[in-house]
Structure formats: structure tokens, C-alpha cells
Amino acid sequence: MRLDEYMDIERDERAERRRLAEEKSYGILDHLETFQDRFEETVQGDSLYGGVSPSIFVGRSNYPNVSTGILSPVGHDEDAASFETSAAWYDEGVSIDDVFQRRTSLLNSNRGTKVTNVADSWDGFLGTQREVAIADRPVTVEIGLDGKPSLDLDASADDVATPVGPRARARSADLAENPHVPKLVKKTLEDDDWNAEGAMTYLYRRGFDVYDINTILSAGALGQTEQRRLVPTRWSITAVDDTLGQYLRGQVKHAESVDGVEIYRNEFIGNAFWVILAPGRWEFELIELKAPGSVWNPDPEAGMYLAADREGYEGRTGYVNETAGAYHASRLGVLEHLQERGRQAKALVIRHVSDDYWGPVGVWQIRESIRHAFEGEMADAETFGDAVRDVTEYLPVSLADLRRKSTMAAGLQTDIFDFA
């Protein structure tokens, strides 16, 4: 699955994105070239024996006929778990290079299928894939392959899913061990009364993080049996963040408001985040500023690109048009913090994407950056307007620019100096 299958972009823009990535890190290209050597050392005949799989991937191109695969880190069986996207990546302080190098080591052994074929099947390739998805640790699998892998890296310009590395067509897949499946996951599989949203919330309330739930949902292992479907990875990430966000909003919207205006900041792999919480009923907005020369805005001569989406007290009913998965990931982080405190607030998140963010690594970095922002030192302000003005001092745009794009900022009283 190539970049142009994720997003409609002009050919010259696609070329510019590739040029930017190659210019920023030749090490990733070198890593792809060494993958072939590791692959040939690992494969016996035409099968990959003893590969340890930490996760799966479901594509979205040609939906409902999709490419679905089992991910295996070739030559890295002992630390297979570290190759799967998780909150631990933030704790490790991974770089963009680290993410791309780990993902280029993951062989995507895939085959085409209809999303409806999963139903309650536990046999064959789809059955093995599902076992990998619901297990709470990497599973040893034996995969029969047709030919050598295609050495390429698919990185989505929408930056929702983590990049996917080399891929090969799979003839078969079999378990080489009995996977360990948590009892709570077994319960959601056996209880046919739950819809997918209810099952997601059940697992989340009992300590499962979004990463685990996303993989289980993507494999078609949640919901009523006749309604179970494979869910493309990109869609499942957003669906889980959105579903859990709606649940948490319901928990906080009747709580007491925060007492004063609070400002939090965090920075991670070329992204800077500001979170402003102010007294009042629940309201949320995400503003994104994307610098020229970044993967989002590759023309170095272009101006700063601004995008924004928001919701009021009752939430959203329409599609998030401009900020996509980043909106749901950042909102979840804010709502988790408020729910833990037993408070509600009106919340403004500002994300500044610098030109250091040269390759899209997925919305996990947004989710974790917001989650950890609240662990840092908090600043305060007299009013919401003062907080926005204070934060704007650190942004490459004026308050007037924000007011033109942001509904929440547009409500501030205008001062002549805001146009400076």
C-alpha cells in the first residue's frame, strides 16, 4: 500500500515528501537494504519458521476487499514486543529514526480478503491473525510465503497509523504455540450481547490501553458475532480514540468545573503542544500549526498551515474534517486527565509541527504527548484570553491568525497589538 493510496495528493507533492524523508535520514534507506539479508538468514525454504509476531495490520485500500497481514520482526524475535506501537515508546524517548527502523524490520505477511469473512472464524490465516491480535504477548507463528518481500515503506501522510515496512504475500499461517489470551478478552468474545462500542469501553475501564483495544477491534474480535468485521488499522485507531473519548466525556460533563485557568506544555519528536484548561462547561478545540518544510507542509517556501476542529458540550455529530485522528487522540488525553481529577473544563490544545517532524510516525505520539503534558509544571493565567495571548508569544503566528482559524480564540476581545 503506497502513500498515494492513503491520501489524494499531487504527484509533485508526493515526490517532495519522499525527497524530504530521504534527505533527512539516509539511515532508514540503509536499514531497508539490510532487511533482505536478515530475511534470507531467517527463512527456510519458502516459509518463515519461528517468527514471533507482536501484532497485525489491516489495510483500507479497495475496502471492503482489503489486505490483511501478520507483522513479524525479522531477526529480532527476542525483543519482538518493542516493535509494536505502544505507550512505552514515549517512555523510551524514541526518535523518528527509531520508529521507522523498527517498522522497517517488521515483515507484513499479508493476503487479500473481504472484511466480512472474519465472522467467528478461528481457522486458517484469519484465525491465526486473530489469535495474534487478542494475545497479551507476542506469539510464535509459522508463515508460508509466496516469493520474497517487497522492500518498501508505507508511511501515511495523514499520520494516523504507524508506518508499515516490507511486505510479502502469505499462503498460510499457523500457530507454533498456544497464545496467552486475557480472561477479560475471552469474556468479550464469548458474550454475544455486547456491541463493539460496549466491549471497547468494558476493556478500557478494566485497564486495557487503547493500543490493545485497537488491535483486537482491527482483527474483528469485538462486537456481536454477526456484526464482526475486519477494521482497517487506520480506522480502528480513530474509532477507539473516539469511542473512549465519548465515554469519558459522559463521565466529566456533569462534574464540577476546574477552578482557574491552567496552562500545560510538552514537546516530543518535533511537535510542541500547549493545553489550556479554563473554567466552564466542556468544550474542546484542537488547532494545528504545520511548519513549511515539515512532512505535512513540504514546500519550504510555503507559509504556516493552520487547521482546526472543535466540539461543544454535547460533542460532535459530524466528521472531523481538518485534524483527523490527531483530534481524537488529543481529546482522549485531555479527557483522561479531567476524569481522573473529577472535573470538567473548556479545553484548547495547540499543536505546533516543526520542520524537525520530517516523517509521520502515527497519532500515538500526540496521544502520549498530551497524556504526559499534565505531569509537567503547570502555569496559570487570570483569564482564558490571557492564557491564549501568553501561549501565542511562543508560536510562529499572531493571535489574529489564531482568531481567523479558531472558534475559541475568535471569542477573545481584539486588541490592536494582536495583529503584530
From Swiss-Prot:
A motif (PIP motif) lies at residues 413-420. Coiled coil: none annotated. InterPro entries: Nre, Nre_C, Nre_DNA_repair, Nre_N. One of its GO terms (biological process) is DNA repair. Keywords: DNA damage, DNA repair. Disruption phenotype: Non-essential, but cells lacking this gene are sensitive to DNA damage induced by treatment with MMC. Does not display increased sensitivity to UV light or to the alkylating agent methyl methanesulphonate (MMS). Transmembrane segments: none annotated. Interacts with the DNA polymerase sliding clamp (PCNA) via the PIP (PCNA-interacting peptide) motif. Belongs to the Nre family. Involved in DNA damage repair. Works together with the UvrABC proteins in repairing DNA damage resulting from exposure to the DNA damaging agent mitomycin C (MMC). PANTHER family: DNA REPAIR PROTEIN (PTHR38136:SF2). This is DNA repair protein NreA. The gene is nreA.
